[in-house]
């Protein structure tokens, strides 16, 4: 297999130490003069590998010795993207402290979408707190919320909604609620409706979310129950939350309001 031979011959001891978290070996190689930014034919750096392996100590050492924080592979992967693949909050935090770009040069490898897809809630939370565009709509993926719903990552969907993600923004005409209905997730559907999802929205096939579930199923019955108008309390909550835009959770928490009212606004 020529391809695998090329891959192996392109592999350096520096990459090997980084992916496996061998800090002592990494230090020795760097001290002996190895290039911290040595890349493979695919432009994969030791920092990419350290983050992919979730090895924060190795990533920290590489960054201190001049590793490029925004290096891009031929697949458009940045170290930040690699950290979102592994779900390493420690690596993610390090990269952000060293000036990593939240938004990649190409939508083929979006960190927030990757974190949402894999269910890495803490990564989603950290990216959100640093100001990532949580409604970033990638043509072939949709929004982070849509990706979370498509992959049945309830906790990530909740975190995005709490942070002010647009509940109706999905992939083209397909809404997050359509994705939740397709996966027959009662929990996701209830969550989205609670945050004001439009149950009447039609996708490219002119189908509403409820038309994507088997009639008579628990989810089908839930949609029938929710067909009526929202209560005045729900409408007020949605209106107030919209006023705060992104980072709603932090802003509402800081309001001088009774705790019970805060809990209601926060969907606690």
Where are these regions (language model features)?
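Cullin-RING E3 adaptor/co-adaptor recruitment helices
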Residues: 183, 190, 195-268
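N-terminal segments that cap or nucleate solenoid repeat domains
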Residues: 1-41
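Conserved ankyrin/ankyrin-like repeat signature
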Residues: 25, 57-58, 90-91, 122-123, ...
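Ankyrin repeat domain, specifically the short helix-to-loop turn at the C-terminus of the second helix
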Residues: 28-34, 60-67, 93-100, 125-133, ...
């Amino acid at each position: 297999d020529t391809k695998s031979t090329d891959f192996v011959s392109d592999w350096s001891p520096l990459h090997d130490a980084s992916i496996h978290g061998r800090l002592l070996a990494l230090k020795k190689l760097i001290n002996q003069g190895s290039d911290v930014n040595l890349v493979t034919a695919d432009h994969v750096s030791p920092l990419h590998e350290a983050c992919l392996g979730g090895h924060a100590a190795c990533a920290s050492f590489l960054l201190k010795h001049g590793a490029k924080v925004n290096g891009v592979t031929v697949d458009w992967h940045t170290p930040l993207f690699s950290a979102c693949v592994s779900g390493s909050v420690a690596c993610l935090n390090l990269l952000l402290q060293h000036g990593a770009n939240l938004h990649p040069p190409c939508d083929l490898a979006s960190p927030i979408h990757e974190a949402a897809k894999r269910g890495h809630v803490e990564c989603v939370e950290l990216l959100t707190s640093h100001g990532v565009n949580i409604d970033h709509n990638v043509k072939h993926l949709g929004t982070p919320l849509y990706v979370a719903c498509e992959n049945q990552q309830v906790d990530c969907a909740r975190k995005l909604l709490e942070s002010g993600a647009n509940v109706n923004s999905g992939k083209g005409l397909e809404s997050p609620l359509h994705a939740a209905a397709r996966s027959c997730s009662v929990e996701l559907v209830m969550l989205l409706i609670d945050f004001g999802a439009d149950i009447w929205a039609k996708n490219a096939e002119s189908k509403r979310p409820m038309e994507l579930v088997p009639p008579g199923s628990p989810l089908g019955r839930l949609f029938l129950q929710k067909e009526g108008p929202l209560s005045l309390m729900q409408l007020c909550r949605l209106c107030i939350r919209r006023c705060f835009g992104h980072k709603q959770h932090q802003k509402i928490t800081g309001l001088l309001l009774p705790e019970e009212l805060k809990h209601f606004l926060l969907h606690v």
